[in-house]
Amino acid sequence: QRDFGDAIVLECPDGSLVGRNFADIARERSVHVVDLFLDLVVEFGRALRWYTTVGNDREDTLLKLVQDPRTLITFSDAGAHIRNMAFYNLPLRFLKLIKGAADRRQPVMTLEKAIWRLTGEQGEWFGIDAGRIREGDRADLVVLDPAGFDQDLQQVSWAEMENFGLQRLVNRNPGLVRHVFINGRAAVSDGEVTPELGHEPGFGRFLPAH
């Protein structure tokens, strides 16, 4: 843990600790924050859950990083850590970051370039036939509602994992992703996943590098 002042208690049998950070609790109890943290873990075990910031919290630095041509903005690592991370919506957060800078009249790149960095640039870098809208190509499209960027994209919630008997962390950004088409077939329609996705073939295919 880099800074216990950045770690906020989300769940705890002692409800008075929820919403507070470990550093404040330690000061209140006049103990070292590491001792406080370990004592709480021993006392509450897995019933103690907390949220912490591990990076990308300095927006000025983040804006510099996303402008660097050596930075490839692809996907997050959240899918490998379903119980303790949820930033599956990394591309949406990137677009909101760029839109916010433009709204403050401090633009760092156009939205068109930001979208290209998420699509065409990656197709070129990986050498796959993807990331562009051209006549005769597969129709792989995402339709976003710009008004949806007004919500907090860092919010996380719990959702049941079908057939696993446990919950995972998810991002829910209602109204932002309106439609998704994969190979010309609707995968998301009016913000809802279509029943055919994952149950019928034809939504995509292997894309070899060239």
Task: Provide a role label for each language-model segment.
Residues 30, 77, 95, 114, ...:
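Hydrophobic, well-ordered secondary-structure elements that form the walls
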Residues 43-48, 80-84, 124-125, 149-152, ...:
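Flexible loop/turn segments at secondary-structure boundaries
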Residues 48-56, 62, 109-113, 123-156:
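Acidic, glycine-enriched loop/beta-strand segments at the rims
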Residues 97, 101, 120-124, 128:
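Conserved helix-loop functional segments at active or binding sites
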